[in-house]
Amino acid sequence: MAKAATIKIKLLSSADTGVFYVTKKNSRTKTDKIVLKKYDPVVRKHVEFRETKIK
């Protein structure tokens, strides 16, 4: 059985509020860490969310 190409990742807020989004990415084509600007409802602003592993 082959290994799955897509993995689930957690996007954690860089504002240290504990807010996170869960998404998936293709680990074979996207080898670098994902950084996206998304909305953080705690600080009520758009901030950078960085990829971390789901534990």
Curated annotation (Swiss-Prot):
A GO BP entry? translation
Instruction: Read off the InterPro entries from this record.
Output: Ribosomal_bL33, Ribosomal_bL33_CS, Ribosomal_bL33_sf, Ribosomal_zn-bd
Q: Which GO terms describe its cellular component?
A: cytosolic large ribosomal subunit
Annotated GO MF terms? structural constituent of ribosome
The record, for PROSITE patterns, names: RIBOSOMAL_L33
Q: Which cysteines are joined by disulfide bonds?
A: none
Keyword Ribosomal protein among record annotations: yes
Ordered alphabetically, the record's keywords are: Ribonucleoprotein, Ribosomal protein
Read off the PANTHER family from this record: 54S RIBOSOMAL PROTEIN L39, MITOCHONDRIAL (PTHR15238), LARGE RIBOSOMAL SUBUNIT PROTEIN BL33M (PTHR15238:SF1)
Family classification:
Belongs to the bacterial ribosomal protein bL33 family.
Q: What is this protein called?
A: Large ribosomal subunit protein bL33
Q: Which organism is it from?
A: Xanthobacter autotrophicus (strain ATCC BAA-1158 / Py2)
Which lineage? Bacteria, Pseudomonadati, Pseudomonadota, Alphaproteobacteria, Hyphomicrobiales
